[in-house]
């Protein structure tokens, strides 16, 4: 029977009669268990121990030889006369020594801690020695050479929960809107966010790598559906008058959409009239800047602000009244 313990929980795996273990006996091997713990639980805060067998060879003196030696010493001390000792050959002496001592294999079972390397990033850097950093480096990389340097830093942000966003939403907001991206500036300057904020809607910024995966698994939160602002066909809260104007724009520019789709057939999937661009001049400036520079500059790069300002002065303003379609304005800038 083999088993191992996880902390004080006492998780015990038995070999006898368990079909899963009979099919995969390698998961009972000491080597395999250590690999799993190292891969998935190396830096767990509580100790993980494995009940292992330890063997060692030890030279144990022969009890009978020791008794004879004691008797000889006592006899020598009691006799004042010098004792004549028959000294044999070296081979005989070596044989006697070998007879006196023999090797015995000793077995011992102990609880071996598998995750000795503690999460040192949770500790104060001033309390961590260079040796501890070295041990951490070796356990993490299996590289036994000395590390070159150490940079220990800690970054913490304010913990916020998704349900807290409900408190700042307006009563007419039917969905929980979110946008994913690499930086806060990137998502905050998105045309999608600009449109929703114009309508007074709250948008959650998700800029962590894990956010995009997690939010895809979250379909609903407290009776409100979770919706990406970049989703095709995103519906915004509009009154009847706004809906009527939008339908009129779609009808008016239906032929233009078809022409643009035919011209850009291999480059675009669809051309539609959108109400998500509240400031087309701002978006056009970004496109104009990239064309001017002749390369795809990161539009959120702060080093490009000076260049952007200079180009904006050269950029002719868009023409048209408030009732002019957003698509017409963008098209007219060319």
Swiss-Prot record:
SS bond list: none
Residue ranges of the region described as Disordered: 55-107, 314-334
Motif TPR repeat-binding: positions: 327-331
Coiled coil: 234-267
Pfam families linked: HSP90 (PF00183)
Modified residues (Phosphoserine): 89
Keyword annotations of the record: ATP-binding, Chaperone, Coiled coil, Cytoplasm, Nucleotide-binding, Phosphoprotein, Stress response
Keyword Secreted: no
Biased composition (Acidic residues): 85-94
One GO CC term on file: cytoplasm
Subunit structure: Homodimer.
Function: Putative molecular chaperone that may promote the maturation, structural maintenance and proper regulation of specific target proteins.
Protein name: Putative heat shock protein HSP 90-alpha A5
Species whose genome carries this gene: Homo sapiens (Human)
């Amino acid at each position: 029977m083999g088993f191992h313990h996880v902390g004080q929980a006492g998780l015990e795996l038995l070999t006898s009669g368990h079909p899963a273990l009979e099919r995969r006996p390698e998961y009972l091997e000491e080597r395999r268990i250590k690999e799993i713990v190292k891969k998935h639980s190396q830096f767990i805060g509580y100790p993980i121990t494995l009940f292992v067998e330890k063997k060692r060879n030890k030279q144990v003196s022969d009890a009978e030889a020791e008794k004879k030696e004691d008797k000889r010493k006592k006899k020598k001390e009691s006799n004042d006369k010098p004792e004549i000792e028959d000294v044999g050959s070296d081979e005989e002496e070596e044989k006697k020594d070998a007879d006196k001592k023999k090797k015995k294999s000793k077995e011992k079972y102990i609880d071996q801690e598998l995750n000795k390397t503690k999460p040192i990033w949770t500790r104060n850097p001033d309390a961590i020695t260079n040796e501890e950093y070295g041990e951490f480096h070796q356990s993490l990389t299996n590289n036994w050479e000395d590390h070159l340097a150490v940079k220990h830093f800690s970054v913490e942000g304010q913990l916020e929960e998704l349900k807290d966003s409900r408190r700042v939403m307006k009563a007419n907001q039917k969905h929980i809107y979110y946008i994913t991206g690499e930086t806060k500036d990137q998502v905050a300057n998105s045309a999608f966010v600009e449109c929703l904020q114009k309508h007074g809607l709250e948008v959650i910024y998700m800029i962590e790598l894990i956010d995009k995966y997690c939010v895809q698994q979250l379909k609903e939160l407290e009776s409100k559906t979770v919706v990406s602002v970049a989703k095709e066909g995103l519906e915004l809260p509009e009154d009847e008058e706004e809906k009527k104007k939008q339908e009129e724009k779609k009808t008016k520019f239906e032929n233009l959409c078809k022409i643009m789709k035919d011209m850009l057939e291999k480059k675009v999937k669809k051309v539609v009239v959108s109400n998500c661009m509240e400031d087309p001049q701002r978006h056009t400036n970004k496109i104009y800047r990239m064309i001017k520079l002749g390369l795809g500059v990161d539009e959120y790069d702060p080093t490009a602000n000076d260049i952007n300002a200079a180009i904006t002065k050269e950029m002719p303003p868009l023409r048209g009244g408030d009732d002019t379609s957003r698509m017409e304005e963008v098209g007219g800038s060319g």
